[in-house]
Regions:
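Sequence context surrounding c-type heme c attachment/ligation sites in exported
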Residues: 2-11, 145-159, 167-176, 201, ...
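Extended intrinsically disordered, low-complexity coil regions enriched in Ser, Thr, Gly, Ala
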Residues: 19, 52-57, 67-75, 164, ...
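Electron-transfer interface patches adjacent to heme c in soluble/periplasmic c-type cytochromes
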Residues: 29-59, 80-89, 175-216, 228-240
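Extended, well-folded interaction surfaces typified by the phenylalanyl-tRNA synthetase beta subunit core
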Residues: 105-122
Length: 265
């Protein structure tokens, strides 16, 4: 459970890092194009945390985006990715979180305009863009490739930053891992095959970057620095190399250059 929580980078979003917050106690302001959402308290505190949640409640949150009271969760919480995890895996994460010291925190109100401040509006978003699905192994691919795809598309939720979004904030299939934006930060194309954004990286380069935060070509910056320091550096070498195997299998197509606007217009 602890390992999966590290892979999912739960601590980064659920800690008010900017104000020296207590780990996993929530309160971090997540600025989205639609307003500000404050992360939840994941400690087992009864009033403001997960103290009264059951394993079933937690599974529903990660698998269906529904909280213990049946309310829809905003997709700033990456359940569209976490849904690939099994019940056994979510139960393990829950067991780890329940072992933390309970922390009572004052909950911040989300700052969202109408009608987005009404959680029922998320149901429409889910109908359009969310699919509760299980991970399916591709029998034609290696064990490492399948493990890498599970990690990338599931716990690591790489597409949350590195996939372009539509106007409603859902990932676009044709922009899968081709680069995206988050809080005015550009997350680059991480497809590693022919014409991909990291085509010039080797699998060793990807491993070194995720494990040690170093590479011949760049260093982790902004949110990616958090990902390495809080999440990927703690993952096993076998898993990180599986991620590299999967990313290096993703070819890309050159983008058509955008036409410059006519200065006379």
């Amino acid at each position: 459970g602890r390992y999966l929580a590290q892979a999912g980078d739960c601590k980064a979003c659920h800690t008010d890092i900017d104000n020296d917050g207590i780990p996993f106690a929530g309160g971090r302001a997540l600025k989205t194009p639609f307003g500000t959402i404050y992360s939840a308290n994941l400690t087992p505190e009864d009033e403001t945390g997960l103290g009264r949640w059951s394993r079933e409640d937690f599974y529903n949150a990660l698998n269906e985006g529904i909280d213990d009271e049946g309310r829809h969760l905003y997709p700033a919480m990456p359940y569209p990715y976490f849904t690939l995890m099994t019940r056994q895996q979510t139960d393990a994460i829950f067991a780890y979180l329940q072992s933390l010291e309970p922390v009572h925190v004052e909950e911040e109100e989300n700052d969202l305009p109408f009608p987005l401040n009404i959680r029922m509006s998320v149901s429409g978003w889910k109908l359009l863009f969310f699919e509760d699905e299980e991970f399916e192994v591709d029998p034609d691919r290696s064990e490492a490739w399948n493990r890498g795809r599970f990690l990338v598309d599931g716990p690591l939720h790489c597409g949350g930053c590195h996939t372009g979004k539509n106007i409603l904030g859902a990932g676009k299939d044709d922009e899968y891992l081709r680069g995206g934006t988050l809080e005015n930060w550009f997350a680059p194309n991480i497809r590693g095959g022919e014409n991909g954004g990291i085509a010039h990286w080797s699998e060793d380069d990807i491993f070194e970057f995720l494990k040690y935060g170093r590479a011949k070509h760049t260093a982790p910056m902004q949110r990616m620095g958090e990902v390495v320091s809080i999440s990927t550096q703690f993952l096993e070498e076998k898993d990180l190399r599986s991620v590299a195997t999967y990313l290096k299998s993703l070819d890309d197509t050159p983008r058509e250059p955008e036409e410059a606007p006519d200065p006379a217009q």
